[in-house]
Amino acid sequence: MFMVSLVLILGACSNPSSNQEGDSNASNSKNSIEIAFRDFGSGNTGLKEWLDAVKTEFEQKHPGVKVQFVPIQASEGDFFAKLALMVKNEQTAPDIVTEDTFMINSDAAAGNIDPLDKYIEQWDDWKNFNDRVKQGVTAVDGKVYGIPYSTDTRGLWYNVNIFRKAGLPVPWNPKSWDDVLEAAKTIKEKVPGVVPFWANSGKATGEATSMQTFEMLLYGTEDTLYNFDTKKWIVKSQGFLDSLEFIHQIYSNDLGPELSQVLTGKAGDIVQTELMPKEKVGIVLNGNWVPGVWREGGPSPWPEGTEVYKLTAMPTQHGQDPGFTSMSGGWALSIPSKADNKDLAWEFIKLATSEKYNKLYVLKQGDLTPRLDVAEDPEVLNAPGSVTKEAASFIKFTHFRPGVDKYPAVSTAIQAAVEAVATGSLSPKEAMEQYAREVTRVVGKENVEVRK
């Protein structure tokens, strides 16, 4: 169904004396738009179905125009590297890219993507997008660099059958990290043969390790990654150390998965399509989108999935106010600076993020919507297998990653620290020291601080 192509502007490779051939190639480029996105298997079949539906209507509305997809099969970290190379080259730059919102500032600062303000100023539909989500696609220069099509929250998924076997309460509402650790220890003791606790823990899972694991812990402490008052990165803090210590407790007490399962780029598929449907994991620290793979017609249909696994809020470290924590991010459609067909790309983005197609996307993929109208749609709120109501309730205490252009490099250092602790190659304190050195190297010693 998908037209898999990395479109090259062949005119640059043609006979330079042939003006007719060059004109033909230029014309062809104006009759097609290319959309690059990360294809990570079963985890985003809903995204593909959404894009395919938009493509069909778009081509009907624009006779003679072809929409071509450029799926990039890669781990998260490799995807960003490949995409960066692609958009920097005029011959390979697509017209639209799916942009993880944490990359907006760095890609904008690098000149890789265009601001969209000139289009938004004439687009009345922009008022229907959540203002907090808009912040995630606005760079430090105050300009908008992407139109969001998803947002999310994170929490703890727990298996009600495993909890009952272990004698743990259902519903489960942990009030502190100690409650979470004690539940995992009880599962290990009372229900052998299952993974007590799962959290992404390796470099191969990229931002999922940084955000879904480490930052879900750190932002439940009294500390953060970045001090917006001083505009400095906090490279050492008690909260940072305690977050790594939590990870150490999981793996040193054999409460986590096998390293061969969690240190691979396929970790997301393993937990969502194998361990959870087989009821082989007790607690999973993950996002609201998980049931998207279990929907009817999805990659791993499991209609009763959200009856077996319930979503509960992640507590703060000691239960301190506000009691719970979450992290929110999302994805957007952006236009590379070296795109061939920017105006037509904008027309596609408008259609793809419209009420009609954003509703289709969230129903297919399981993400939360950035649109105010779709958020109130009864079909979305009451969709079978949906956890929209629960996940949306986490927004009131959620946090966002620092919108600073060095964040992607800092995130890579976080992933290295988490993996080092999970594998036991470094102690939590040693891993924090390694992180401090690496971040200082990346951002400069004048841009870091230690919090006592």
Predicted regions and their residues:
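Glycine-centered hinge/linker elements that transmit conformational signals in sensory
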Residues: 183-186, 229-265, 310, 314-317
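Extracytoplasmic/periplasmic solute-binding protein
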Residues: 141-149, 154, 179-239, 272
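Hinge/lid segment of periplasmic solute-binding proteins
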Residues: 101-155, 181, 195, 210, ...
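Short, solvent-exposed loop/beta-turn-alpha elements that line the ligand-binding surface or hinge
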Residues: 117-129, 173, 201-204, 219-242, ...
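Conserved N-terminal structural module of periplasmic/extracytoplasmic solute-binding proteins
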Residues: 5, 10-112, 121-127, 170, ...
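Extracytoplasmic/periplasmic substrate-recognition and gating elements
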Residues: 56, 60-61, 66, 84, ...
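Long, aromatic- and glycine/proline-rich binding clefts that accommodate carbohydrate-like moieties
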Residues: 63, 135-137, 306-314, 328, ...
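A structural signal for short loop-to-beta-strand junctions that line the ligand-binding cleft
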Residues: 85, 92-95, 125-163, 195, ...
